[in-house]
């Protein structure tokens, strides 16, 4: 993404050329938009709870606060593996989830039988989720990629709290809803298996984006 910001700066410098400015009709505004990737989900949820933001993505939040109200056309760019590519492929939409397991702490060597291992619950949940993958249609392009952001506090203590974050992506809204329900079911199953509790917070992400082919005049200008 550092390269994308460099591209914005390069475009701004190019548009200061007097010959270029003569050909422009209107005004050009440059946005350095944060939070495209929608990471750090729990942190963003805390900002939402505080009323500081409503959406976890930079473009969504800028739209909400009116930053694009007087914009007629926007041009975005992204790094890729080609010298130049005009237009875009369709993009998955997604919801974000924070999964919090609560167990019971105990000494991992002296009395593990007195504890409820939240990390074991999370491991079972991840395994259950993996077994859902064959139920996803290829055409729906479902992608679910969780991470563990908190796995325990001390190595000699049975973990009593484990936190995961994940995005649930798919190419259409029905597929997102289906995959999200299966994700919840899998993670809750892990909690049931070991007697832990499971709390899942789901937040809206992006809707699927359907792209049209680039206009011929745009392709010619890009050349």
Predicted feature descriptions by range:
Residues 3:
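Active-site His/Glu-centered metal-binding helix of metallohydrolases
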Residues 6-90:
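Acidic/histidine-rich catalytic neighborhood of metal-dependent amide-processing enzymes
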């Amino acid at each position: 993404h550092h390269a994308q910001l460099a591209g914005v700066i390069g475009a701004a410098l190019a548009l200061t050329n007097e010959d270029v400015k003569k050909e422009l009709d209107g005004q050009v505004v440059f946005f350095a938009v944060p939070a495209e990737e929608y990471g750090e989900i729990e942190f963003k949820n805390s900002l939402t709870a505080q009323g500081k933001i409503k959406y976890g993505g930079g473009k969504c939040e800028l739209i909400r606060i009116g930053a694009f109200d007087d914009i007629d056309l926007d041009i975005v760019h992204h790094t890729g593996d080609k010298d130049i590519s005009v237009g875009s492929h369709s993009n998955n939409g997604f919801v974000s989830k924070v999964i919090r397991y609560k167990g019971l702490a105990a000494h991992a060597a002296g009395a593990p039988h007195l504890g409820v291992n939240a990390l074991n619950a999370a491991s079972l949940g991840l395994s259950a989720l993996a077994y859902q993958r064959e139920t996803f249609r290829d055409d729906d392009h479902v992608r679910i990629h969780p991470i563990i952001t908190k796995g325990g506090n001390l190595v000699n203590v049975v973990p009593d709290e484990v936190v995961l974050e994940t995005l649930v992506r798919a190419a259409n809204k029905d597929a997102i809803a289906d995959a999200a329900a299966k994700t919840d079911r899998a993670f809750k199953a892990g909690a049931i298996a070991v007697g832990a509790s499971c709390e899942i917070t789901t937040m809206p992400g992006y809707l699927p984006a359907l792209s049209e082919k680039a206009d011929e005049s745009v392709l010619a200008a890009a050349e």
